[in-house]
């Protein structure tokens, strides 16, 4: 098991008050590492697939980042990344299910990172 996954699970189970965590379902852009999400934000100019391809090419890993339909539990913000036109929160997520033709199916929990666009207002 990856050390980051162990830390995320420990954080979710020991550092916060006892509560049920709500899972979210839907399409999400996920990457294996926070650094990959930061790079995704740098090359993102409105086309998610092009940015994903760029990161995957740089990483020499066709699966480093992907857009997928999942069920996940979101963790706390671990950083903010900016491009010239967008700003994103970077958050860890633990994927607990994937969407199949029969609906969402549970999977072994796996840690990934995702960007969440910040709505910025001109002042």
Regions found by a protein language model. Give the residues of each.
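SH3/SH3-like beta-barrel superfamily modules
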Residues: 68-109
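Positively charged n-region of N-terminal signal peptides that target proteins for export
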Residues: 1-4
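SH3-family beta-barrel domains
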Residues: 19-58, 67, 122
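Serine/threonine-rich, low-complexity intrinsically disordered segments
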Residues: 15-16, 116
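Residue "hotspots" at secondary-structure boundaries inside conserved domains
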Residues: 63-65
């Amino acid at each position: 098991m990856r050390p980051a996954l162990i830390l995320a699970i420990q954080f979710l189970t020991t550092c916060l008050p006892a509560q049920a965590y709500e899972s979210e379902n839907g399409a999400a852009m996920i990457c294996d590492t926070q650094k990959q999400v930061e790079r995704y934000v740098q090359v993102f100019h409105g086309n998610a697939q092009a940015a994903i391809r760029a990161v995957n090419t740089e990483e020499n890993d066709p699966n480093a980042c992907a857009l997928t339909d999942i069920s996940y539990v979101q963790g706390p913000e671990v950083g903010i990344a900016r491009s010239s036109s967008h700003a994103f929160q970077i958050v860890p997520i633990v994927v607990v299910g994937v969407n199949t033709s029969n609906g969402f199916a549970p999977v072994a929990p796996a840690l990934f990172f995702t960007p969440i666009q910040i709505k910025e207002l001109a002042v």
